[in-house]
């Protein structure tokens, strides 16, 4: 996962990788994670590397989120920090997610096929609000943009992101969870209109 973070940073022109840990307390598991991260970082001199204890990371994400670029951590801390990040940008309704493997799908033919991946909205299916027209589809749409990037359809991904940002700028087309007046379909229609 640490190598992936650096490769992701390089591929997406990111300038810094922050490794988040609790090695001061969890000396064996997190200590190994930290030591491994420091060794791997030496292979990427073009990318700034820092390590940070998880509680300090949570505070700094709230105070100065712009100081972070790529964060790599273990699952437990990742779950917590990703929900914190979602809260900073408007809630789980706007947060995309991806699970990306390190090899192509078993049925893929060409060696250049992208790694097997799954993209989803962080909030899951939200069955409690299904059919009510109050769901915010932003997270799912941004996950779709990530999927498009993943399969090298970057122009389509950029168009989708532009459409989403356009719809989010007005209370008339923003969903209620973000202080807007639009329902799910109205927001979706606004995104589509902005993409034309």
Which residues are covered by each model-predicted region?
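Glycine-rich phosphate/diphosphate-binding loop of Rossmann-like nucleotide-binding domains
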Residues: 1-55
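Generic structural signal for well-ordered alpha-helical scaffold segments
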Residues: 3-7, 62, 145, 192
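Flexible, glycine/charged-enriched surface loops at secondary-structure junctions
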Residues: 12-21, 44-52, 153-161, 170-181
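Class I S-adenosyl-L-methionine
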Residues: 38-42, 165, 196
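Glycine-rich phosphate/nucleotide-binding loop
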Residues: 61-159, 163-172
């Amino acid at each position: 996962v640490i190598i992936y973070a650096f490769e992701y940073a390089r591929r997406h022109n990111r300038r810094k990788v922050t490794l988040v840990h609790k090695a001061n307390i969890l000396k064996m598991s997190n200590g190994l994670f930290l030591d491994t991260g420091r060794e791997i970082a030496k292979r990427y001199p073009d990318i700034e590397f820092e390590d940070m204890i998880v509680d300090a990371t949570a505070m700094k994400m709230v105070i100065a989120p712009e100081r972070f670029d790529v964060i790599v951590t273990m699952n437990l801390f990742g779950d917590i920090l990703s929900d914190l990040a979602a809260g900073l940008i408007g809630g789980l309704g706007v947060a995309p997610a991806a699970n990306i493997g390190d090899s192509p799908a078993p049925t893929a033919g060409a060696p250049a096929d992208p790694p097997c991946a799954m993209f989803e909205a962080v909030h899951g299916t939200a069955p409690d609000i299904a059919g009510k027209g109050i769901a915010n589809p932003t997270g799912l749409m941004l996950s779709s943009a990530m999927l498009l990037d993943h399969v090298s359809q970057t122009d389509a991904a950029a168009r989708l992101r532009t459409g989403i940002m356009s719809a989010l700028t007005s209370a008339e087309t923003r969903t209620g969870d973000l202080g807007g007046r639009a329902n799910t379909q109205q927001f979706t229609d606004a995104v589509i209109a902005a993409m034309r």
